[in-house]
A protein has these predicted regions:
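Conserved active-site and cofactor/substrate-binding residues in soluble primary-metabolism enzymes
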Residues: 29-36, 105, 109, 165, ...
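Short coil/turn connectors at secondary-structure junctions
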Residues: 15-19, 92-95, 121-124, 139-140, ...
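Hydrophobic/aromatic beta-strand patches that form the interior of the parallel beta-sheet core
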Residues: 51, 96-98, 127, 184-189
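Flexible, glycine/proline-enriched loop segments at strand-loop-helix junctions
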Residues: 24-28, 98-107, 157-165, 195-199
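A conserved C-terminal secondary-structure "cap"
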Residues: 196-322
Length: 322
């Protein structure tokens, strides 16, 4: 196991067997749900900066570019895309929150840095958050699937054991590295509507936080996300109401979802790509395809998913500007 050579400590507080909660933007973060969830925790749990992972070894800066910012005196500085860590202390539970872009290079070494921080604090568990695209309606309750490697964790929190084989993102490598180092690991995945793939989903973020809170025992407020989720639903409803073919498709999708009786055997569960009672070709991670596929019973006039996605994005941007 690597040492902490790529970790830049900001402060080193005392923590009591913290849970490490990690999310990364990119491939495993459909509709920004996982990263939004951790960002919300940072902003609402009194999180304090703990450390940063030096991005130089792990980032392709031609893909994720640094930004130039102006200081108050008009001088400039560069903000580098960095994975940051925060600490949270409370009477009930301590946390280490990890958030940043999925690294492009040297994944094993990167994950060893995170796991070394977990070892430094004798962490109790490492839990990754993710989100995937699926044929689910935006009006329905967000489905969250949890998987784990430790049988006690599975039994205590109604999680499932992974049986997935296939491509993985950084969360899969991180969980494997942590498990190999002796840590209990778990993953929580939220399903977001494929037809609104590029629209940030506060609804899915809230669902992830609620499920996470049940496992780690923290009281994380979600009122702000829930209010944003209500607006998110209303805006998409307004847009779809002006498109009869899409309204018909959504109605059929909702009816199909209402008829589905999900149980443990319906899931192809994993740290990387769980399946919510649908076939693998009905799922797509953000960034894998230019347009996530729509499947299931279609209306008489096929829905152009590219055009719909662009229309949804333009509509929500215009609502934000208003």
């Amino acid at each position: 196991m690597a040492d902490l050579e790529h970790v830049r400590w900001i402060r080193r507080p005392e923590l009591r067997r913290p849970h490490v909660i990690a999310a990364f933007t990119g491939w495993n973060d459909a509709a920004d749900a996982a990263s939004t969830a951790v960002k919300h925790l940072v902003e609402n749990l009194g999180a304090a900066p703990l450390a940063e992972i030096n991005p130089e070894e792990f980032t392709d800066f031609a893909t994720i570019r640094p930004h130039v910012r102006l200081n108050s005196d008009s001088t400039r500085h560069i903000v580098w895309p960095t994975v940051s860590l925060w600490s949270v202390t409370s009477d009930d539970v301590d946390l280490i929150l990890v958030l940043g872009p999925e690294p492009a290079l040297r994944w094993k070494l990167f994950c060893e840095q995170i796991v070394s921080v977990a070892r430094e604090y004798n962490a109790s568990t490492l839990i990754s958050l993710g989100a995937l695209l699926a044929d689910v309606p935006h009006r329905h309750e967000t489905q969250v699937l949890g998987t784990a490697t430790d049988q006690a964790l599975i039994d205590a929190h109604d999680l499932q054991r992974s049986r997935y084989e296939g491509p993985t993102g950084i969360v899969g490598v991180l969980n494997d590295t942590a498990h190999s180092a002796g840590f209990s690991t778990a993953s929580l995945w939220a399903a977001v509507p494929a037809y609104a793939a590029q629209i940030p989903s506060p609804k899915a973020a809230s669902a992830l936080i609620e499920r996470l809170s049940e496992i780690v025992g923290c009281d994380a407020p979600t009122m702000m996300l829930d209010a944003q989720a209500a607006l998110y639903e209303e805006q998409i409803d307004d847009l779809i109401s002006n498109d009869p073919s899409m309204a018909l498709y959504l109605d059929r999708l909702e009816n199909r979802s209402d008829d589905d009786d999900y149980d443990e055997d319906d899931y192809d569960e994993d740290d990387d790509m769980p399946s919510y009672g649908v076939s693998p070709d009905q799922l797509s991670f953000e960034g894998m395809d230019d347009a996530p596929p729509l499947s299931g019973p279609l209306p008489d006039e096929p829905v152009d998913s590219d055009a719909l996605m662009e229309e949804v994005e333009q509509f929500l941007r215009s609502q934000h500007d208003d």
